Amino acid sequence: MAEEKRDPALETEETAVQPEGASPKKKKEPETLESTLYCWTQALVTAVVSVVLLFTFGVRLISVNGPSMQNTLYTGDELLILNSMFCAFQAGDVVVLNAYNAEEPLSETLVKRIVAVGGQTVDVDPVSGTVTVDGQVLDEPYIKEPTYTTAGTQFPLTLAEDEVFVMGDNRNHSSDSRDIRLGAVNVGYLQGKVLLLLIPGATPETEARDWSRIGVLR
């Protein structure tokens, strides 16, 4: 009768001796319904607390009301705002500010675009409608029409280090830093920077929501 051959590797496995002092492997106990519910509850509570803290101290939602930021923003647009304490404001940012420093109330809050920041000199040509900052003509593809001025802020205007100059993208239908009631805005009055357009309002042309507008503002 032929002798059965054994695989040396298997023999090694079979005769392997557990090292001295090593603890035996424990079988993983199956998860109970209680432990599963506990894990899900813990994750849910953590998520809710994180969202509450985020919206309390970090971000918040606001609605646009008025035509001053067309064609970038429209009435009914819902925006996600990053709190000012986390912002380093720069020219081109779309920001939310309160107008409490205005000589006459303009609105509780305003949504505008920063055109110039502290230390810069801004000027508006009354003939061509071009805006210059520190002598450089701004490239402003976002504005609805050229910028024209009426009696108000005197140009050229050099900003203090803690000021910004803001204007609406719908330049000729916007109360902003060109208006002597508001003027240059102290950065302490900036509530935050617009991060995202979350929900679009209806555009005047189509009276419908254009969902392709959702995203980061430019």
Model-derived segments and their meaning:
Residues 2-218:
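Extended hydrophobic leader/signal-anchor segments used for secretion and membrane insertion
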